[in-house]
Amino acid sequence: MARIACFVERYNFSDPKESRALENFRRVAHEKGHTFDFMFREGISEIPKYDAVFIRATTDPLFTAYVVSKTAWELGLKVIDDPESIQICGNKIHLYDLFKKYDVPHIPTLFLSKDEIHHKRFLEIFENLGKPVVIKAPYTSFSRYVEKVACESSFRDVAKRYFRKSDLLAVQTFMPTAFDWRVGVLNRQVLYVCKYMIPKGRWKHGCKRRGKPTFIWGRTFSLRRENAPLALKETALKACDIIGKGLYGVDIKEIDGKYVVVEVNDNPSIYAGYEDYRNRDLYGKIIDYLAD
């Protein structure tokens, strides 16, 4: 029997779909004979009492979740997400460098530094990547700090704003598609496969409503992992192999039958009725990994 702590924040229970998924994890763990306790930040001193830690709160090197991950890792516990995965996936510049180094097929990407905000560099980028381009700050999540620009003035404005957060930005070719593939990977095996649809009139799965602080999200369609294209799964696994053996969500675009990686995310979303819809065993597989 394993003692599993699931680190969460209050907001993890605000969405009924995520709340049901968390309850599914607890139910499956109990069915397998393990304990599964929800741990909030005030309880992190209890980490040494557990055999494994499963993080569902948003991960970031500056957040409490990272402290939890690093503490559990240093104690020798099984942990999802491990601190190295959080560091790599949380820094898009590092991630794209690894893609280039290990020949992972990915969206064409260039880097922009603070001293390159000038006309000549903008022209070079547009000539290499086309118009429009997508600008990303290194530390992004939930489609935030990701914007599309098609002219030099917009490019300059967005870059200056993002440079308040970072010394380096990623700039990518814009590849419009009706959906992005999301492949969930655990311990170098495909866990689930989904299509994240792009909302009508938008260009990414999660977009901010005009003039409002809220986001609009596209629909999610789940596939049985065995029915997903082999080349898609191979691409996802190759991208994860350079990071580690943890739990990842790989975003992939399909262009003319070929697959290119957008990014790899640690702490991927798992909502009841969405990612699990065609692959109900994902809960058991994650629990088994933690308890092993």
Which residue ranges define each predicted feature?
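Short glycine-rich anion-binding loops that position phosphate/pyrophosphate groups of nucleotides
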Residues: T58-D60, Y139-T140, N267
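C-terminal active-site "lid" helix and adjoining low-complexity regulatory extension at the edge
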Residues: N227, D241, E254-D292
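Active-site nucleotide/adenylate-binding loops and adjacent lid/helix of ATP-dependent enzymes
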Residues: A2-V8, L75-G76, I86-W181, L230, ...
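Phosphate-binding site of ATP-dependent enzymes
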Residues: R144-C240
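A short glycine-rich, hydrophobically flanked beta-strand micro-motif that places a catalytic Asp/Glu
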Residues: F38-F40, Q172, K245-D256
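Protein kinase-like catalytic core scaffold
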Residues: V133, L191-Y192, Y248, V260-E263
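Conserved N-proximal alpha/beta basic substrate-recognition cap immediately N-terminal to
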Residues: R10-S113
